[in-house]
């Protein structure tokens, strides 16, 4: 189902949601951190979704073991590097990795700006080693409140030239976008792109808010957009992309089944929706699974899957020249 003549992208992929179970074991042993299991086989149920979670917040607890072992900046650098290695193994040509530096720093009180620098270094080294092209998106974890998000923003802005965009993720219902207007004003002033997790746990009004108040150019998940025809029209007309994550939305109980997922409707409506993983290690999936298994199960035709692949590059945070160069590189391979 993947068109090998086109660039393969993953533009909604959490770096801190893609920490290998083996790496969690390794770092746990290195730093004498008590883990819930001592073998890879017995650890996996604690760090990977093995059945549908009742809600988004329950799903997010599966991520916690990955960051609990980040006891040094070198550990952060390692998982960033491994994220690029994983992308290369999946055949990705271009990936946008998003990460919450405050979340990664929290368990061991690491310097947040140091975490940002370590991630930048690890991704750079990975790209140089494996030939994948990548951009970084900084996340503010809304669940921790406005002040904590301000700390994350300051740390990201200290390395603003290496960050491409700002995102807001976490508890969408408890911490609406309206709390973070000044944060996004600063991000836009820095020249960053804006993407926002919206319409995942909350309704279409959250997507409208992300666009109108926060300046979102893309929406993460956005499944509730299907409930508002005017919003669907607006997304299509204004070319505001939807970063769809099929398997993730089932595992978080955001959508009841793949057959009920709105991605097919988005594509039929002309919305620039793409296929992405979200948290690959936690979900136990990769981009190949999303194209070959999840997308057909969601009712997408071969041509719609190809369109989603095209959309992934179309809405990527790259210049027109960078997109053209990537298309030419893949076509010539």
From Swiss-Prot:
Substrate binds at residues 14, 16, 170, 279. The keyword Zinc applies. The active site is at residue 200. Coiled coil: none annotated. One of its GO terms (molecular function) is 2'-deoxyadenosine deaminase activity. It is an enzyme of class 3 (hydrolase). Binds 1 zinc ion per subunit. The record marks 221 as: Important for catalytic activity. Keywords: Hydrolase, Metal-binding, Nucleotide metabolism, Zinc. Its cofactor is Zn(2+). One of its GO terms (cellular component) is cytosol. Its EC number is 3.5.4.4. It catalyses: adenosine + H2O + H(+) = inosine + NH4(+); 2'-deoxyadenosine + H2O + H(+) = 2'-deoxyinosine + NH4(+). Zn(2+) binds at residues 12, 14, 197, 278. Belongs to the metallo-dependent hydrolases superfamily. Adenosine and AMP deaminases family. Adenosine deaminase subfamily. This is Adenosine deaminase.
């Amino acid at each position: 189902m993947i068109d090998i003549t086109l660039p393969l992208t993953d533009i909604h992929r959490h770096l801190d949601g893609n920490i290998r179970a083996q790496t969690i074991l390794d770092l746990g042993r290195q730093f004498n951190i008590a883990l819930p299991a001592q073998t890879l086989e017995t650890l996996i149920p604690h760090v990977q979704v093995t059945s549908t979670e009742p809600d988004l917040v329950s799903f997010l607890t599966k991520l916690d073991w990955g960051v609990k072992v980040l006891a040094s900046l070198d550990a952060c650098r390692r998982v960033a590097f491994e994220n690029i290695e994983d992308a290369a193994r999946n055949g990705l040509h271009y990936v946008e990795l998003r990460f919450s530096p405050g979340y990664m720093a929290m368990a061991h009180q690491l310097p947040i700006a140091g975490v940002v620098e370590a991630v930048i270094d690890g991704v750079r080294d990975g790209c140089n080693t494996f030939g994948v092209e990548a951009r970084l998106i900084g996340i503010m974890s809304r669940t921790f409140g406005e002040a904590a998000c301000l700390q994350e923003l300051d740390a990201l802005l200290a390395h603003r030239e290496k960050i491409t965009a700002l995102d807001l993720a976490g508890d969408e219902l408890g911490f609406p976008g309206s709390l973070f207007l000044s944060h996004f004003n600063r991000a836009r002033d820095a020249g960053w792109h804006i993407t926002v997790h919206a319409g995942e746990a909350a309704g279409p009004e959250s997507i409208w808010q992300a666009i109108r108040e926060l300046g979102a150019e893309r929406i993460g998940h956005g499944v509730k957009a299907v409930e508002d025809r005017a919003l669907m029209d607006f997304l299509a007309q204004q070319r505001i992309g939807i970063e769809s994550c099929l398997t993730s939305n089932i595992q978080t109980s955001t959508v009841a089944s793949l057959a009920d997922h709105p991605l097919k409707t988005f594509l039929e409506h002309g919305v620039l929706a793409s296929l992405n993983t979200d948290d690959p290690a936690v979900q136990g999936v990769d981009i190949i699974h999303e194209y070959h298994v999840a997308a057909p199960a969601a009712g997408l035709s071969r041509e719609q899957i190809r369109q989603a692949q095209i959309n992934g590059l179309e809405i990527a945070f790259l210049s027109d020249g960078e997109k053209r160069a990537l298309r030419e590189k893949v076509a010539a391979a």
